């Protein structure tokens, strides 16, 4: 694999192979840490679904620049959207709702202070690292194993959501909505995902 060439999936520029391999190793550590899948026989996949496991591919990106590289690699499933399925839908906050919240925060004098105890309100942004790995898989999905984790005759049965599966966003939505409700938040009436 040392002679193999890797390219940035966004820019198309050639990437340093050693940095790509390090980024992929980091991603595989996350797969193990979050127990994303259990290895099972490909035979089980065929018995349960009547189909081969879903293929996977690496998405490699340099989020930095040539002087300060910041390589990120994500292993994603290649589940093809053959048909539209409403049961896999995940709500997304409309841009208008976000604009309304920011406008309201500014006009009410809340500002963007991290801890504004005087007004009793707080506006904050949260970015969950590898969010989908925190969501349980809610349907039976089998994926091929990447070269870095392959075992002959085996595939992965998802335990957690995986980027590239059709219901990953919905699984994450169910997980974070349950958490937010549990700590006291309520869904909006006009936009339930706010």
Go through each PLM region and give its residues:
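Chromodomain-type histone methyl-lysine reader module
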Residues: 1-189, 194
């Amino acid at each position: 694999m040392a002679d193999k060439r890797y390219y940035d999936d966004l820019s198309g520029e050639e990437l340093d192979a050693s940095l790509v391999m390090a980024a992929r190793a980091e991603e595989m550590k996350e797969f193990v840490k979050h127990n994303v899948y259990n290895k099972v026989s490909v035979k089980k996949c065929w018995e349960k679904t009547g189909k081969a496991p879903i293929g996977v591919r690496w998405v490699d990106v340099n989020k930095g620049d040539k002087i300060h590289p910041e390589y990120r690699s994500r292993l994603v499933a290649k589940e093809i959207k053959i048909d539209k399925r409403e049961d896999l839908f995940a709500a997304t906050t409309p841009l208008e709702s976000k604009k309304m919240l920011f406008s309201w925060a500014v006009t009410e004098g809340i500002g963007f202070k991290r801890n504004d105890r005087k007004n009793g309100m707080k506006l904050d942004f949260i970015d969950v690292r590898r969010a989908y790995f925190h969501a349980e898989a809610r349907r039976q999905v089998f994926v091929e194993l990447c070269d870095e984790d392959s075992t002959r005759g085996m595939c992965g049965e998802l335990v957690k959501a995986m980027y590239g599966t059709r219901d990953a966003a919905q699984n994450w939505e169910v997980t974070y909505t349950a958490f937010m409700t549990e700590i006291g938040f309520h869904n909006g009436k006009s936009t339930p995902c706010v």
